[in-house]
């Protein structure tokens, strides 16, 4: 056991943010189908505290899914956000949501070689970004 606590050495901000634009429909909850890489654990691992999702156009009722993949390429569903039907305009913003834990713990810790992926249930366009994360 370490005698000093291990904090993230590099906070990923600005250009280091891991972002993807998702648009291919994927109704699977088992990690198959089209998935979009959000971030990969560095050589000493990564801590992810928050993942934000923002629609870029009109949405219909659907789901955004978050998966973790281990080094053996096993995918596990770790979260879902329900998307509501919204038609954006000058007075109505597009749908948005975030994956975040409410108990103060990180959303997930990615070991070296592990990765975080997202998918969208419907063929609609979403930007997904790990906005609060760091590399150990």
Give the ranges of each region predicted by the language model.
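Short proline/glycine- and polar residue-rich coil/turn motifs
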Residues: 83-94
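Beta-sandwich interaction modules
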Residues: 93-113
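Short, surface-exposed beta-strand/strand-loop-strand elements in extracellular ectodomains
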Residues: 59-81
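Exposed beta-strand and adjacent loop surfaces of beta-rich binding modules
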Residues: 48, 61-65, 125-129
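Short solvent-exposed strand-capping/beta-turn motif centered on an Asx-Ser/Thr pair
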Residues: 54-58, 71, 121-123
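Buried hydrophobic-core signal for structured, non-transmembrane domains
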Residues: 49-54, 116-118
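C-terminal interaction-tip segments
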Residues: 2-44, 109-136
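Extended extracellular/luminal ectodomain segments enriched in beta-structured repeat modules
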Residues: 42-50, 59
